[in-house]
Curated annotation (Swiss-Prot):
One of its GO terms (biological process) is photosynthesis. It is a single-pass membrane protein. Keywords: Electron transport, Membrane, Photosynthesis, Thylakoid, Transmembrane, Transmembrane helix, Transport. InterPro entries: PetM_cyt_b6/f_cplx_su7 (IPR012595). The 4 large subunits of the cytochrome b6-f complex are cytochrome b6, subunit IV (17 kDa polypeptide, PetD), cytochrome f and the Rieske protein, while the 4 small subunits are PetG, PetL, PetM and PetN. The complex functions as a dimer. It is found in: Cellular thylakoid membrane. It comes from Gloeothece citriformis (strain PCC 7424) (Cyanothece sp. (strain PCC 7424)). It holds the Pfam family PetM. Its main location: membrane. GO terms for molecular function: electron transfer activity. This is Cytochrome b6-f complex subunit 7. Disulfide bonds: none annotated. One of its GO terms (cellular component) is cytochrome b6f complex.
């Protein structure tokens, strides 16, 4: 595994983690907002 492929995989992993984190946070906010109403 070359350094370039490691950087590429790391970048993809970071983006995926950020997207999952945003989706999870949005889902929790939506659930909490629904219960509050």
């Amino acid at each position: 595994m070359t350094a370039e492929s490691m950087l590429f995989n790391g970048a993809i992993l970071s983006i995926v983690l950020v997207l999952v984190g945003l989706a999870w946070g949005f889902l929790l906010l939506k659930i909490q907002g629904g219960e509050a109403e």
